[in-house]
């Protein structure tokens, strides 16, 4: 549902010409296909024994981390504790929440400077 809402918002509210929006749509579709190609990797995560999930993201990925956190909380009816934070903010206290039953997922950026923080944390 998040992807559909995001694509709809981009198509409706972005004043860019339709041809440019169409190209962007193709890029997003291609990225979505790559995610689906990783289904086996995702299944490995689901099979882990966890009761906490922490999503980390910076810049535009901060909102994505928040949305992902809400989805897990909603889909598990609160049975899985969730949190979201930026990678830099996570270092200052929240990382103490990690235990053996915690999965931490980082939405890494491609910005060289910020990516250093993402990789260092991982």
Please tell me what each predicted stretch does:
Residues 1-122:
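A SIS-like phosphosugar-recognition module
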